[in-house]
Every structure is written in structure tokens, then in C-alpha cells.
A protein has these predicted regions:
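Gly/Pro-rich active-site capping loops and adjacent beta-alpha segments
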Residues: 104, 115, 131-150, 196, ...
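Helix-loop-helix junctions that connect adjacent transmembrane helices in secondary transporters/permeases
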Residues: 157-244
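Glycine-rich and small/hydrophobic secondary-structure elements
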Residues: 90-131, 265-317
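Short coil/turn connectors at secondary-structure junctions
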Residues: 40-43, 67-71, 110-111, 117-121, ...
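Alpha-helical support elements that line or immediately flank enzyme active sites
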Residues: 46-77, 81, 122-143, 213-259, ...
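A generic local secondary-structure boundary/capping motif
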Residues: 34-35, 62, 111-114, 182-184, ...
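Flexible, low-hydrophobicity surface segments
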Residues: 1-173, 193-196, 282
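Beta-strand segments within the central parallel beta-sheet cores of soluble alpha/beta enzyme folds
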Residues: 250-257, 284-294, 322-326, 354
Length: 365
């Protein structure tokens, strides 16, 4: 379309446009993952930790395996025996001094310890959703609770309990952008300095449609079809292929039908989908999982939770002469794919770039 056509008669600029995609949704004709029913489908349910931090002293699925309709139980031990992989961060962030990021991988099942409420310790697959959820309650887990913190400033205190002891700290990375010396000098000479402490609360996307996965395994051709509530189906296929199940990419088809809200949470690769695909392959039949609303709050990717101290220096005419931002970003007990880079972008890039060139400094941890 030429510029003349866009602005002229029959063009679109400056005119209200009639939406064309809404009719089938308001008539109840949308097709979501949970609407898809395959013959012989089995259901998956997960056993999740009720503790924010605890040692797993014992785990037994024997009682659950004997429940009516149960087809399969899975734990970290089974995952390791199968040789499957773990999730890693897509965009790692290093420290400003060059040290690598303190990033622990995300296993499909907790091993030895749980690191947050909702951490998965086992899975049960059964003939029906009810049977799977009932059997999941029969899985026996002996926990030994450990100290935990939920506030980001408490997490960086000297005596804070460590989420991943091997790093010796709860700080994942620290990046500084800008010129510290020039910013401090400009701030010292400013006619007025305003300082503000800001709390950007943690949030859950909580879409109307919860996360849901349905995997169909074709044993004759050794290939998979995965229906997923995913905002990024191509990435999802690659992650299953490269990082976790090591399925050749050409043997895995991922379909995202209508998605009932995502807001970023459905763009994150979750561990539940790996388990469902694996279970479908083991059982040679379709396997489905749809999160409950409780699971949505416990296990969906969350956002924000930043504690920020912002300082701005002004000259006697009220013009900005310097700006300094220090942010603590709570990334959770287990890193999600883009979380570190998102914290960097929101603090170091989105905050600094709109302003005219002047001494600025931003630090995000």
C-alpha cells in the first residue's frame, strides 16, 4: 500500500477499524487446548512442595502407584535414569567485573531439596484427571523444613539462608551501566537532590485460561504432536529438543491453538510440559495436563518484585543534571529463561535511554 492509498479514500489511517476476530469467541467457538480431546487420553497431576525451603528426607510413590486408574509415577530418580536434561537461562547476564552469572539449572523434579512453594517433587499419570489428582495426594514425602526468605532485601542480607549453597550468595548477577565518577560529581554539585524508594510489587499474570498441554505420541513413526498454551511454540519445540528430552526437532510438532491470555507467562518454558511429553512416549498414548487455579498462582512465571532507590539531581532552574538508580530484582529461587535480561532491560536500558545525555548510573542486582 502506498502512502497516498493509506491516507486517501479507502485508507486506514485516522479511521476506526472494525474488529474481525471477535465473533467466534463471543459465540463460544474458540478452540483451546483443554477443548481438544484425543482417544485414550491419560491425565497428569503433579505433587508440589508445601514448603518454601526444605530438605527431602524420603519420597515414596508406592501407595500412589496402587491407586485405581494409575498408569505411571515419575520422580527425579526416573528423570535422571532416562538421561534427560535440565533447563538453562537463554540470556545469561555476567557481573560487571566479568564473573559469570550464578545460575543453577531448573530440573523437572526437585532433587534432595525444594526451593519454593509449588516446587515439583513427583508426577502421577492416570486414566482420568480425578484419579491422577487423588493418587498425587497419596505420594508420601518427608520434608525437613529449612529457613527461607521471601523479601528481596532480606535475601541479600549477610546472614540470609542460601537458595543455592554452591554459589555462597543469593546474588545472581550485578550489572552497572553509566559513569559512576561523573554521576557522583554532578550529584554533589546539584542545587537539589530528590531521592525516592520505590517498590514494584510482584505480580502473577493469572490468565483466564490456565496453562495446558496435550501430547500425542505416534509410536509407529516415533514422532510427537504437542498442543500447548504457548506464546512461543517454536522456542518450546527447540527447548524440548535441545535442552530436556533431546527429541530430534523434525520429530516434534508444536501447535498453539487459541490462547486465552498469556501476558508473558505462557512465553516461559515450564517443566510440566517436558514431563507430559515424556509420559506420552512411555505410555504410547496421549497425555494431558491443565493447571488448576491454585497451580497457576504457585507455578506460573511471575514478574516484577523490584526494590529501587532512585536519585535525581537538579540545577537551580529545575533541570535534571544527574540520575542514579539502584535496583534489587527478585528473580525467584529458579531462574526462568529471560528473567535476568528482563531485569537489566527494565533498569539499565528502559530507564536511562529516554533522557537527554547527562551523567547517569544504573545498577541492577
Amino acid at each position: 500500500m502506498t502512502a497516498e492509498q493509506a491516507h486517501g479514500q479507502g485508507g486506514y489511517i485516522g479511521k476506526a477499524l472494525r474488529r474481525r476476530e471477535d465473533v467466534r469467541f463471543v459465540q463460544g467457538q474458540g478452540r483451546y487446548v483443554d477443548d481438544i480431546v484425543l482417544p485414550g487420553v491419560a491425565w497428569c497431576a503433579f505433587v508440589r512442595s508445601p514448603h518454601a525451603h526444605a530438605r527431602i528426607r524420603a519420597l515414596s510413590t508406592k501407595a500412589a502407584a496402587m491407586r485405581p486408574g494409575v498408569l505411571l509415577t515419575l520422580t527425579a530418580e526416573d528423570w535422571a535414569k532416562a538421561g534427560h536434561g535440565e533447563l538453562t537461562v537463554v540470556h545469561p547476564m555476567s557481573f560487571s567485573d566479568g564473573r559469570p552469572m550464578n545460575a543453577a539449572p531448573r530440573p523437572a523434579f526437585a532433587r534432595g531439596k525444594v526451593h519454593h512453594i509449588g516446587d515439583i517433587v513427583a508426577a502421577v499419570v492416570a486414566e482420568s484427571r480425578f484419579a491422577a489428582e487423588e493418587a498425587a495426594e497419596a505420594v508420601e514425602v518427608d520434608y525437613s523444613p529449612l529457613p527461607a526468605v521471601v523479601a528481596v532485601r532480606a535475601a541479600v542480607a549477610p546472614a540470609a539462608p542460601l537458595v543455592h549453597a554452591q554459589f555462597g550468595t543469593n546474588v545472581v548477577f550485578e550489572i552497572e551501566r553509566g559513569n559512576r565518577r561523573r554521576t557522583e560529581a554532578a550529584m554533589a554539585s546539584a542545587a537539589k537532590v530528590v531521592e525516592l524508594d520505590l517498590k514494584n510489587n510482584r505480580l502473577s499474570a493469572n490468565p483466564i485460561e490456565p496453562r495446558s498441554y496435550l501430547c500425542d505420541y505416534d509410536a509407529a513413526n516415533d514422532c510427537y504432536t504437542l498442543y500447548a498454551t504457548s506464546q512461543q511454540p517454536h522456542y518450546l519445540r527447540r527447548w524440548l529438543s535441545v535442552y530436556t528430552l533431546h527429541i530430534p526437532e523434525h520429530k516434534l510438532r508444536v501447535i498453539s491453538p487459541d490462547v486465552g491470555g498469556g501476558f508473558g507467562a505462557k512465553g516461559i518454558f515450564s517443566t510440566e510440559v517436558s514431563t507430559g511429553v515424556w509420559a506420552a512416549q512411555l505410555l504410547r498414548r496421549p497425555v494431558k495436563w491443565t493447571a488448576t487455579r491454585t497451580e497457576t498462582f504457585l507455578s506460573d512465571a511471575q514478574a516484577r518484585d523490584h526494590d529501587t532507590t532512585a536519585r535525581m539531581g537538579f540545577d537551580r532552574h529545575g533541570r535534571i543534571v544527574a540520575m542514579q538508580i539502584d535496583t534489587l530484582a527478585a528473580l525467584g529461587a529458579k531462574l526462568l529463561r529471560y528473567a535476568p535480561s528482563a531485569a537489566k532491560v527494565s533498569t539499565c536500558i528502559a530507564t536511562m535511554r529516554p533522557w537527554r545525555s547527562k551523567p547517569m548510573r544504573a545498577v541492577v542486582s
